Amino acid sequence: TTMKKTILLIALAITSTISYGQSTFDKLEDMDGVMSVVISKDAFKILSKFNFESENEGNEMTEVFKMIENLNEFKTFSTKIPEIATQMESMVKKAVRVQKLTELMRLKEDNSKVWIYVKTTSNKDLVSEVLMLVKGIDKQTNGMSEALIVSLRGAIDINKMSSLVDTFTKNN
């Protein structure tokens, strides 16, 4: 019976950690003043079936579609309400602590701040989660957004992502 109790406690601990991670930002979906976009694993599977290989070999869209076939979930939440933006920041800080995310980088320009966190894996080129918080961006978005959370989960190849970001940055 001691063994059963131990196994039950471990199972509960793992389950609560997993469900905490999944529901951390879900409550934002139901809040007034929050815009959300959620894309599921099934949607990524469908999107990855589109074939852009032939004449588009090597272009950005091909690389994007190769990358998304390993994604499980994409969520983004934004608000223009400062009080909700503060709540969102607290939620991200708690998620970072509970899920043991590693800070990848942070950036501050004027009143805007960006934090990017990742969940590392044993493979140094892959992360299982990318979490980004952008706060104080109302001036850049003409009042359309005060804060933004982006959560991406799956097998995320940091090298491919970096390469894509470089490509899009150079093209724009």
At which residue positions do the language-model features occur?
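Bacterial Sec-dependent N-terminal signal peptides
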Residues: 1-27
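Stable alpha-helical elements in mature extracytoplasmic
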Residues: 43, 84, 88, 157-160, ...
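Surface-exposed, polar helix/loop patches in the mature regions of secreted/periplasmic/lumenal proteins
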Residues: 86-146
